[in-house]
Amino acid sequence: VSSNDAHTVTVNGQQIAAEPVVADTLSIVDLAKYPPQVAATIDVPGSVVGPPYAVAVAPDESFSIVSSATKLDSADPKKIVPDDRVSVIDLAGGPKVVQQVTAGAGATSVDISPNGSLVLVANRTEGTVSAFRLNNKKLEPLDKVDLGNPKAGPSGLAFVSDRVALVSRDGDNMINVLRIDGNTITVDPRPLTTGVRPYTLAVAASGNLAAVSNMGRGDDDIDTVSLIDVSSEPFRTVETISVGMSPEGLRFSPDGKFLAVGTQEGTTKKNGSPFQTPNGRLAMYAVDGKSLRKVAEAPVGHWSQGIAFSKNGETIIVQNMVERTLAVFRFDGQKLTAGTPIAIGAGPAALGTAWR
């Protein structure tokens, strides 16, 4: 499921409101066949702001949950302001929006607990995490967890188990462990440290490893990705490697043997910047125990966002926000082979699949 932002564009390194004003969309992409195909597209609020994990898909593919971190100001459509909307989309009979609730300002990464009973949303602008009970494809507000700093910038969020989740804080450079006990959610007093501006979070299907992109200060230096050992407590950062500039896209293969990392490189820099580049990059890393080893890479488009694997791990798509396309690759464990990009009517900004 691809959430597509139609209200935000980048011009000469600056994010501005798109003209003319059109609706954000959500596209259903069939990854079971090659080449992948867009099966349906409907209007659903979405945003490029925040990690590209603002989409969660039920394991049975019957519904999806999409958050929206920004929107156009109703009083001034040339201004982009924080949003708090979270939409539930029925995928089995439509697709169609069946519910819309509010989380917190800057609602971004969203995840469903493994047992399907709890949904968490990181509220990037206000420094909180919203919790919802999930019953019959309906969200019921449960709690809002204050992280203690309104500028914490909670960004990436992922469940490790039904009782534990991780949330990255790119505003103050740490990762919190959230403890879940029934209806009570608390912040573990010991944060994790990975790097400067920890952002996108992913957890392997095995539940033993998590990965986080460290976006850095945005000063055109090489940035990093870290691995966190979550196989036993206390959790601990065990690997950090240099990957390139602005590693926003991040996802484990379904079998956990590879980590895909999308770096934007200099594709969002101002014209004339010595760091401007014509392409971003997709890199594939083999997961060797608790370390990473690069095995393949290929160019992608400008301002790349989410990454998704087909269930068998052989097809990979990458969102190109500026080109409004999905880059398509085949991966055999050793090399990436590019296919024909898929056109998307709005800027593809976040991706979710029914599998990790």
Predicted regions located by residue number:
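Predominantly soluble domains enriched in secretory-pathway, periplasmic, or organellar proteins
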Residues: 1-356
